[in-house]
Protein backbone atom coordinates (compact mmCIF):
# COMPACT_ATOMS: atom_id res chain seq x y z
CA UNK A 1 0.00 0.00 0.00
CA UNK A 2 1.28 3.44 -0.94
CA UNK A 3 1.54 5.97 1.86
CA UNK A 4 0.15 9.44 1.30
CA UNK A 5 2.70 12.18 0.86
CA UNK A 6 2.71 14.94 3.45
CA UNK A 7 0.65 18.02 2.63
CA UNK A 8 3.71 20.26 2.50
CA UNK A 9 5.66 17.96 0.15
CA UNK A 10 5.34 20.31 -2.89
CA UNK A 11 6.60 23.21 -0.77
CA UNK A 12 9.59 21.16 0.37
CA UNK A 13 10.46 20.33 -3.24
CA UNK A 14 10.09 23.97 -4.29
CA UNK A 15 12.30 25.10 -1.39
CA UNK A 16 14.92 22.50 -2.26
CA UNK A 17 15.05 23.52 -5.94
CA UNK A 18 15.09 27.26 -5.25
CA UNK A 19 17.46 27.05 -2.28
CA UNK A 20 19.98 24.76 -3.97
CA UNK A 21 19.73 26.79 -7.18
CA UNK A 22 20.63 30.04 -5.46
CA UNK A 23 23.32 28.37 -3.35
CA UNK A 24 24.94 26.90 -6.46
CA UNK A 25 24.68 30.03 -8.62
CA UNK A 26 25.83 32.20 -5.71
CA UNK A 27 28.83 29.97 -4.99
CA UNK A 28 29.65 29.91 -8.69
CA UNK A 29 30.17 33.67 -8.48
CA UNK A 30 33.13 33.01 -6.17
CA UNK A 31 34.45 29.60 -7.22
CA UNK A 32 33.68 29.58 -10.99
CA UNK A 33 32.98 25.84 -11.21
CA UNK A 34 30.17 26.19 -13.80
CA UNK A 35 30.80 27.72 -17.22
CA UNK A 36 28.88 30.95 -17.73
CA UNK A 37 28.18 31.77 -21.38
CA UNK A 38 29.14 35.32 -22.32
CA UNK A 39 26.33 37.82 -22.90
CA UNK A 40 25.20 38.12 -26.50
CA UNK A 41 25.12 41.92 -26.75
CA UNK A 42 27.93 44.38 -26.24
CA UNK A 43 25.80 46.47 -23.88
CA UNK A 44 25.08 43.44 -21.69
CA UNK A 45 28.76 42.56 -21.68
CA UNK A 46 29.82 46.05 -20.58
CA UNK A 47 27.00 46.19 -17.99
CA UNK A 48 28.09 42.93 -16.36
CA UNK A 49 31.73 43.93 -16.63
CA UNK A 50 31.03 47.15 -14.76
CA UNK A 51 29.06 45.37 -12.02
CA UNK A 52 31.83 42.81 -11.64
CA UNK A 53 34.66 45.36 -11.58
CA UNK A 54 33.07 47.32 -8.73
CA UNK A 55 32.58 44.28 -6.50
CA UNK A 56 28.80 44.65 -6.69
CA UNK A 57 28.34 41.13 -8.04
CA UNK A 58 30.27 39.64 -5.10
CA UNK A 59 27.72 41.20 -2.74
CA UNK A 60 24.82 39.95 -4.88
CA UNK A 61 26.31 36.44 -5.01
CA UNK A 62 26.80 36.41 -1.24
CA UNK A 63 23.16 37.47 -0.79
CA UNK A 64 22.08 34.72 -3.19
CA UNK A 65 23.89 32.17 -1.04
CA UNK A 66 22.41 33.62 2.15
CA UNK A 67 18.88 33.64 0.75
CA UNK A 68 19.24 30.13 -0.65
CA UNK A 69 20.54 28.86 2.67
CA UNK A 70 17.68 30.47 4.58
CA UNK A 71 15.14 28.89 2.24
CA UNK A 72 16.77 25.49 2.65
CA UNK A 73 16.86 25.93 6.42
CA UNK A 74 13.08 26.03 6.45
CA UNK A 75 12.14 28.18 9.44
CA UNK A 76 13.53 31.39 7.96
CA UNK A 77 12.34 30.77 4.40
CA UNK A 78 10.26 34.00 4.37
CA UNK A 79 13.38 36.00 5.21
CA UNK A 80 15.23 34.20 2.41
CA UNK A 81 12.44 35.18 0.01
CA UNK A 82 12.69 38.81 1.13
CA UNK A 83 16.40 38.76 0.33
CA UNK A 84 16.00 36.98 -3.00
CA UNK A 85 12.94 38.88 -4.24
CA UNK A 86 14.77 42.02 -5.39
CA UNK A 87 17.56 39.89 -6.86
CA UNK A 88 15.03 37.90 -8.89
CA UNK A 89 13.44 41.13 -10.16
CA UNK A 90 16.84 42.48 -11.24
CA UNK A 91 17.78 39.23 -12.97
CA UNK A 92 14.42 39.23 -14.78
CA UNK A 93 14.89 42.85 -15.90
CA UNK A 94 18.42 42.10 -17.13
CA UNK A 95 17.16 39.07 -19.05
CA UNK A 96 14.20 40.97 -20.53
CA UNK A 97 16.15 44.06 -21.53
CA UNK A 98 19.60 42.76 -22.43
CA UNK A 99 19.97 39.00 -22.80
CA UNK A 100 16.90 36.77 -23.22
CA UNK A 101 18.68 33.42 -22.94
CA UNK A 102 18.46 33.33 -19.12
CA UNK A 103 14.76 34.15 -19.01
CA UNK A 104 13.44 30.55 -18.68
CA UNK A 105 15.50 29.94 -15.53
CA UNK A 106 14.42 33.19 -13.87
CA UNK A 107 10.78 32.47 -14.74
CA UNK A 108 11.00 29.05 -13.07
CA UNK A 109 12.79 30.50 -10.03
CA UNK A 110 10.25 33.33 -9.86
CA UNK A 111 7.34 30.89 -10.00
CA UNK A 112 8.92 28.78 -7.24
CA UNK A 113 9.47 31.89 -5.10
CA UNK A 114 5.86 33.00 -5.59
CA UNK A 115 4.60 29.51 -4.72
CA UNK A 116 6.70 29.36 -1.55
CA UNK A 117 5.67 32.91 -0.66
CA UNK A 118 2.01 32.03 -1.12
CA UNK A 119 2.38 29.04 1.18
CA UNK A 120 3.95 31.40 3.77
CA UNK A 121 1.41 34.16 3.17
CA UNK A 122 0.74 34.63 6.87
CA UNK A 123 4.31 35.93 7.25
CA UNK A 124 3.88 38.46 4.44
CA UNK A 125 0.35 39.65 5.30
CA UNK A 126 1.54 42.47 7.63
CA UNK A 127 3.37 44.09 4.70
CA UNK A 128 0.05 44.58 2.92
CA UNK A 129 -1.96 45.75 5.91
CA UNK A 130 -2.50 49.50 6.22
CA UNK A 131 -1.89 50.84 9.71
CA UNK A 132 -3.03 54.42 9.20
CA UNK A 133 -3.16 55.16 12.93
CA UNK A 134 0.61 54.64 13.14
CA UNK A 135 1.32 56.91 10.19
CA UNK A 136 -0.43 60.12 11.24
CA UNK A 137 1.62 63.26 11.55
CA UNK A 138 1.37 64.90 14.96
CA UNK A 139 3.02 68.22 14.37
CA UNK A 140 2.84 71.40 16.45
Regions found by a protein language model. Name each.
Residues 55-62:
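Membrane-interface loop-to-helix entry segments
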Residues 63-68:
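Core segments of transmembrane alpha-helices
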